């Protein structure tokens, strides 16, 4: 496990639920991608929802961020907070396969 001394980024991908304190709130997959690409500090965690509602037009649902991370070999720690059981299982299957 890598321990960072200093500032780290935690990303919260969700269209409705506000980010907890200390997280950067991204409402769409494309916003999350831009946030990751421009991060100036190490990314400690990405906490994902699956269903992004009105923001799905901007990059798809949360699983699309996992697709992009795997394609770009960016294997940050992932946590899921989605309430969609099918979406959660699909995301977990992807995490088990690539992470």
Please report, for each region that a protein language model flagged, where it lies by residue:
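Catalytic phosphate/metal-binding cores of nucleic-acid and nucleotide-processing enzymes, i.e., regions
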Residues: 1-99
């Amino acid at each position: 496990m890598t321990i960072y001394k200093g500032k780290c980024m935690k990303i919260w991908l969700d269209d409705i639920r506000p980010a907890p304190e200390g997280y950067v709130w991204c409402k769409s997959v494309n916003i999350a991608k831009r946030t990751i690409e421009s991060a100036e500090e190490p990314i400690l965690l990405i906490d994902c929802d699956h269903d992004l509602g009105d923001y799905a037009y901007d990059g798809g649902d949360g699983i699309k961020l996992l697709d992009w991370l795997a394609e770009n070999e960016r294997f940050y720690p992932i946590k899921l907070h989605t309430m969609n059981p099918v979406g959660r299982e699909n995301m977990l299957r992807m995490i088990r396969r690539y992470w």
